[in-house]
Amino acid sequence: MPNPKRRHSKARTGNRRAHDHLSAHSLSECPNCHWKKMPHRACAKCGYYKGREVLEVEDNKK
């Protein structure tokens, strides 16, 4: 198994790690309740997807 001949510098290591960050999730607006949701998924607030109710959502209002 080959081993490195020389130690990688901090700059070289940092430059490689510069692209390891995570990107933020893209959000779209629910056309039914205008709540932010992930695209291609049912809305967690109203339960609608593509104009149809696919989830039964309970109201937590007291």
Swiss-Prot record:
Keywords (A to Z) from UniProt: Ribonucleoprotein, Ribosomal protein
Record bears the keyword Ribonucleoprotein: yes
InterPro entries, per the entry: Ribosomal_bL32 (IPR002677), Ribosomal_bL32_bact (IPR044957), Ribosomal_zn-bd (IPR011332)
Region entry Disordered, spans: 1-23
Molecular-function annotations in GO: structural constituent of ribosome
Domain of life: Bacteria
This protein's GO CC annotations: large ribosomal subunit
One biological process term in Gene Ontology: translation
Record field: transmembrane: none
Compositional bias ranges of the Basic residues kind: 1-19
Family the entry assigns: Belongs to the bacterial ribosomal protein bL32 family.
Protein name: Large ribosomal subunit protein bL32
Native source organism of the sequence: Koribacter versatilis (strain Ellin345)
